[in-house]
């Protein structure tokens, strides 16, 4: 009887827990995606391709995914470095900096867009300095990239931080004792341990950037074929009551996003198997 009490889970039985989980996943995730698929394919694959194959749509999709990838790569590098600094070093203001990392989570995206525009516009503080150097940030693709970096950075930092905290300093000391250089220790010891979490943060940052709308529309000039992102194009289609066109573009974004995230997931599985964390 004691053994039965020890093995008893605090959660409800498998049937009840699985039923609640599947129901909520269906309502929150599967049904909306299914509705998008049904709406996008209801008027035929040829019609979907006709909408997606337009130059303006291709330009918007290419811009969204290209800048999202660049932003996620930057966040992967800088977010990991920031997490390392916050965990391994004590310095004045560390707690304040750690709290500020979460600001993009709590800040409404429209407010973030307004703040970035005020800062990087030609008459803004940093925008005026960049203008003197012949570099325009706001209302260009550079401004879009900054907005995507802003909203995606916390995903990498917060994902990697707990993993860094679990790495004992003795591991680095043992590597140094065996004659390994800092670069070798970082490349062959630390980096493999961080890779699965870093890839997770990268995927989250990428997914967040692809769907970003609120902060981008303020700092981008929203010029078709140049600074018009795919989510904005969907909104434009909806405002014109072209629901089929909006669904077709949304379906294209869904397919591309799924393919990219699936590839990242395969890389994560490979990295876990390589490090033995299956």
Please report, for each region that a protein language model flagged, where it lies by residue.
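Interhelical loop and adjacent transmembrane-helix boundary motif
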Residues: 9-14, 48, 55, 213-263, ...
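Hydrophobic alpha-helical transmembrane segments of multipass integral membrane proteins
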Residues: 27, 62, 66-78, 82, ...
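Membrane-helix interface segments
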Residues: 89-97, 125-126, 140, 170, ...
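C-terminal transmembrane helix and the adjacent membrane-cytosol boundary/short C-terminal tail
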Residues: 3-5, 16-20, 31, 35, ...
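Membrane-interfacial helix termini and adjacent extracytoplasmic/periplasmic loops
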Residues: 2-7, 45-53, 58, 93-94, ...
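Transmembrane alpha-helices
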Residues: 18-24, 73, 99, 103, ...
């Amino acid at each position: 009887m004691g053994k039965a009490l020890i093995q008893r889970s605090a959660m409800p039985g498998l049937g009840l827990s699985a039923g609640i989980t599947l129901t909520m996943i269906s309502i929150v995730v599967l049904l909306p995606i299914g509705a998008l698929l049904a709406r996008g394919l209801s008027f035929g694959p040829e019609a979907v391709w006709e909408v997606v194959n337009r130059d303006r749509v291709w330009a918007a999709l290419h811009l969204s995914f290209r800048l999202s990838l660049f932003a996620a790569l930057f966040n992967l590098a800088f977010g990991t470095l920031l997490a390392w600094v916050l965990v391994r070093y004590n310095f004045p203001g560390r707690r304040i900096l750690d709290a500020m990392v979460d600001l993009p989570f709590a800040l409404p995206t429209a407010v973030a867009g307004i703040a970035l525009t005020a800062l990087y516009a030609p008459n803004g503080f940093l925008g005026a300095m960049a203008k003197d150097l012949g570099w325009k940030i706001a209302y260009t693709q550079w401004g879009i990239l900054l907005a995507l970096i802003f909203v995606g950075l916390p995903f990498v930092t917060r994902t990697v931080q707990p993993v860094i905290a679990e790495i004992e300093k003795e591991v680095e000391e043992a590597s140094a004792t065996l004659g390994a250089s800092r670069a070798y220790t970082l490349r062959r010891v630390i980096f493999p341990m961080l890779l699965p979490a870093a890839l997770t943060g990268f995927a989250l940052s990428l997914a967040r950037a692809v769907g970003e709308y609120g902060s981008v529309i303020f700092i981008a000039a929203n010029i078709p074929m140049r600074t018009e992102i795919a989510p904005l194009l969907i909104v434009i289609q909806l405002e014109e009551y072209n629901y089929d066109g909006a669904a077709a573009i949304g379906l294209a974004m869904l397919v591309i996003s799924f393919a990219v995230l699936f590839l990242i997931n395969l890389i994560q599985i490979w990295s876990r198997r390589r490090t033995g964390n299956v």
